[in-house]
């Protein structure tokens, strides 16, 4: 199965705000494809939306290491990490990750 198919499925769960399904499906996919950063991203996004910030932190911090030459995905990881640390009450790390995301967005323009 091409990886675009499950990524589109995860995007549709996100758009429909089905975050419980999103996080479970993404977690299942990343166990089968452990080097695919998109699955970590979507799992983290789902966990953030469900306010499961510790799970989001773990999956996002692992997944960011698999992002290679994809500044958009990297910026999205940093945004989700910022949301995670905001939820965990760590404002210094929240600001750090939002700043990194902002820097990547500026470089892309």
Where are these regions (language model features)?
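Start-of-helix register in tetratricopeptide repeats
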Residues: 4, 37-38, 72, 76
């Amino acid at each position: 199965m091409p990886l675009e198919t499950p990524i589109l499925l995860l995007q549709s769960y996100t758009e429909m705000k089905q975050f419980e399904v999103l996080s479970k499906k993404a977690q299942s996919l990343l166990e089968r494809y452990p080097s695919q950063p998109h699955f970590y991203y979507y799992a983290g996004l789902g966990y953030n939306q469900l306010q499961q910030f510790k799970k989001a932190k773990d999956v996002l911090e692992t997944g960011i290491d698999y992002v290679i030459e994809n500044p958009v995905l990297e910026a999205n990881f940093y945004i989700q990490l910022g949301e995670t640390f905001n939820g965990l009450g760590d404002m210094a790390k929240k600001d750090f990750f939002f700043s990194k995301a902002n820097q990547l967005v500026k470089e892309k323009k």
